[in-house]
Amino acid sequence: MAKVSSAYLKFALVMILLLSVISAVMSAGCIKNGGRCNASAGPPYCCSSYCFQIAGQSYGVCKNR
């Protein structure tokens, strides 16, 4: 088995922690089902990843598909 430098291991650990924090922040900022959303706008997004919006309306509703 090849030796891995401690600097590489530290870097990998920091990257994993950073990605975990980013993922937690992004999921915490989502809109729950029943909340208002805009399918064509940016964050926050629906937790279900689906915004039901009828054409011509300014907002939609987060729901499961």
From Swiss-Prot:
Name where it mostly resides: secreted
Q: So which residues are the signal peptide here?
A: 1-27
In terms of domain of life, where is this protein from? Eukaryota
- Expression tissues: Seed specific.
A single BP term in Gene Ontology:
defense response to fungus
The question of whether Disulfide bond is a record keyword is answered with yes
InterPro entries in the record, alphabetically? Antimicrobial_C6_CS (IPR013006), Gurmarin/antifun_pep (IPR009101), Gurmarin/antimicrobial_peptd (IPR024206)
A family per Pfam: Antifungal_pept
Report the record's disulfide bonds.
C30-C47, C37-C51, C46-C62
Keyword list, A-Z: Antimicrobial, Disulfide bond, Fungicide, Knottin, Plant defense, Secreted, Signal
The listed locations are: Secreted
Q: Which GO terms describe its cellular component?
A: extracellular region
Q: Does the keyword Nucleus apply?
A: no
User: Any idea what job this protein has?
Assistant: Possesses antifungal activity.
By sequence similarity, the record places it as follows: Belongs to the AMP family.
The free-text domain note is:
The presence of a 'disulfide through disulfide knot' structurally defines this protein as a knottin.
Full protein name: Antimicrobial peptide 1
Phylogenetic classification of the source organism:
Eukaryota, Viridiplantae, Streptophyta, Embryophyta, Tracheophyta
